[in-house]
Amino acid sequence: MWNQFPDNDISSDLSTLADDMIHLDLRKSSLCFTTITSPTTSVASLAEVEVQVKVDEATTLLNSISSHFSVKPTNYGGRGCFANTDLAQGTIIHECSMPLSSTIARPFRKEVCGSCFKFLCGKTLKFKLMSRKNKQNNSTSVSTSASASDASLALYFCSQPCMDQFIALDIDDLYRESLLNVESLFIKGLNEYQYDLERKKQEEEAEIEAELKLENELKQAKNIELFISQKWQEADINCQLQLSKLKPKQRKNFNNLIYLIPKINENEYMEIKYIIGILFQMYKRDNCENNKLSLSSVSLSSLELQIFQLLQSNEIEKVLKYPYLLHSYTNKIYKFLKMSTLEKLQPYITPSIIRSIIGKSLTNVFGIWSIDEPDENKELFGYSLYPSASFFNHSCKSNLIKIKKGSKIIFKLVKNIQKNEELCIHYGNSINSVLEIRQKDLKEWFFECLCERCLEEMNLKNAKK
């Protein structure tokens, strides 16, 4: 799930607007005409112009990613990156200095650096960032004597500079405390189950029953998209109703909310931390003027956040393939966020925003691996999102390589490229495998490869029949 798979389509918002206009049968109209038209026609024309302006703005934004390539429609559908000029082998055509958001799998949270993703061969990292609420561990210095429970509530880094970088990019410790809050609640859930195995069994059975019920309803739904949207709205309404029963002061005390917060598994834990990273970037965008942050880091994350809005969501396709995810998304992840996320991020927790973040992560994130080479035996540590790199399509005979330097990703040409030639990377770990295995892996991510290598192997296979 955590390989990088690019978006190929226009923003879902723009697509929705365009679809609405097609259904309305709007006709093209020039604003310079002086012919008197009906109000309906005028409104329609203005709406059409407004959509075109948004499309033009999106195109301009995407083409500002790099001077070496432009993002254009491909002849096989969707969008891709095409060289603006002839380019020589070895040319670095794009760099991403840091991800918009990232998440580390819980088993590796003490072994993989939270800033640069460095892995010290399974050793516990020594630089730990504790919650400022923890009076006994109020500093950000190296700690080696914390208790087991304290050690669990920390963010881990490989060095002081990496920890300092994380702190510098934070605002009033909001990101730090948000991530540690998820960790704390996850541990509380584990502890509750540890001492009440019967309750754990009952809740697991109830969850399976809820998943099956939702799956059957999904199969019977006449309008799949409408059904999924309704389930998200129901989840939001249920959260609001439960919160409305508490007084404002009670809502601020997590002890009053703990019984409302769902228990999550490790996959949901990863997803929630990733979502919080995006929510924090949205908060930073809206509040950067009031904080002493590096202008370069703010403008960079703001640009990536704008590009993020243009990525394609594959939420519907993923839910249809794995119906149990709808229960996970709505009744667990969304509810967990709504009930437990810190107050400053709450305005961003809406069904539309969380759906967008989840849907776009499914096919656009890069895996954080133990080694940066195609190898089916390498270990997955987590995943990260670089929106500006999400428009490179896949080819089993790619002309680009990804070079990772810490959390930075560099895209470098491995061959000479002609003007207008598409620039492609390869996805997944099966690049050295046979055609059938490669195709099977790619279909998991709703992608069918018809690159030069695949076509050659298909033709060779057909010739042998």
Label the model's feature ranges.
Residues N238-I401:
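Catalytic cores of histone-lysine modification enzymes
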Residues D13, A18-D20, D25-I36, S42-S45, ...:
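Conserved AWS/pre-SET-to-SET junction and N-terminal core of the SET lysine methyltransferase domain
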Residues S102-T140, A148-L246, N253-Y259, H394-K465:
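C-terminal SET catalytic tail plus cysteine-rich post-SET Zn-binding segment of SAM-dependent SET-domain
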Residues N8-T16, S30, T34-S45, T144, ...:
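Intrinsically disordered, low-complexity serine/threonine-rich segments
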Residues T37-Q52, S139-S147, A206, A210:
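Compositionally biased, intrinsically disordered low-complexity segments enriched
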